[in-house]
């Protein structure tokens, strides 16, 4: 729900009156696509419900989760390649960092769920996942004219 609100706010912020700069139009389209795709992946992750007590059910749920996390990593990689308009160029570093953190998170989740589970590796994956989303939140806060440190 929070991601939907962020998407709506971003759409409103980036919608202006009159003619719009082509770079801003492209940026807005790419940001909207990124937010839509995150929302979809988030919904898919939250719908992974076929975890049963048997190994087959757990294996299927794990495969589904890994597939969605891989899609998430792909979306963050695309996000890092978005060309930010000149006024927001300085935010590109946050998009790059978000992608790097998500790649590390997904790699770590694969290790946790497919290779060798350890609490420390799961914590490491969660921390990188959180850091990735924190960078996205900073970008969205700035685009909304809010103080990301507040």
Label for each model-derived stretch:
Residues 18-20:
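Bacterial signal peptide processing site
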Residues 1-4:
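Positively charged n-region of N-terminal signal peptides that target proteins for export
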Residues 13-16:
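C-terminal motif of bacterial Sec signal peptides marking the signal peptidase cleavage site
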Residues 26-100, 104-150:
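Alpha-helical segments in soluble extracytoplasmic regions
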């Amino acid at each position: 729900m929070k991601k939907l609100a962020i998407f709506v706010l971003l759409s409103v912020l980036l919608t202006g009156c009159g003619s719009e700069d082509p770079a801003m139009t492209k940026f807005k389209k790419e940001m909207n696509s990124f937010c839509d795709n995150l929302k979809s992946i988030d919904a898919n992750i939250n719908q992974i419900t076929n975890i049963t007590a048997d190994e087959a059910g757990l294996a299927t749920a794990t495969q589904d989760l890994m597939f969605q996390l891989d899609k998430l990593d792909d979306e963050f990689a695309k996000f890092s390649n978005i060309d930010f308009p000149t006024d927001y160029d300085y935010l590109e570093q946050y998009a790059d960092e978000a992608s790097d953190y998500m790649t590390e998170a997904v790699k770590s989740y694969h290790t946790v769920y497919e290779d060798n589970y350890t609490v420390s590796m799961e914590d490491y994956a969660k921390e990188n996942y959180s850091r990735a989303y924190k960078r996205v939140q900073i970008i969205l806060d700035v685009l909304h004219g809010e103080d990301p440190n507040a």
